[in-house]
């Protein structure tokens, strides 16, 4: 990845963020997309070879189907993890 990306971490997930002068400014991409796939599979993603990880936003990972071009999103955290993260923020 390009060194112009900003590296950030939120709720234990490391992201690359597009620079402000990019048309994709602010878009977050996981540093390790395999983690996004593993999480999505755990939450019900079928046929992972048919999907591309695209980006993350609002605590969800977004995937695009290779064939249909449809998007699908999966939450990054379950209910228990969301509660833990909210207490950490306080």
How would you describe each model-predicted region?
Residues 13, 17-86:
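Acidic, low-complexity, intrinsically disordered interaction modules
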């Amino acid at each position: 990845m390009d060194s112009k990306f900003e590296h950030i971490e939120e709720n234990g997930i490391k992201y690359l963020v597009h620079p402000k002068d990019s048309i994709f400014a602010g878009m977050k991409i996981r540093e390790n997309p395999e983690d996004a796939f593993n999480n999505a599979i755990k939450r019900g993603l079928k046929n992972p070879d048919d999907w591309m990880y695209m980006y993350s936003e609002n605590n969800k990972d977004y995937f695009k189907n290779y064939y249909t071009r449809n998007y699908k999103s999966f939450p990054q955290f379950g209910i228990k993890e969301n509660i833990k993260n909210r207490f950490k923020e306080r």
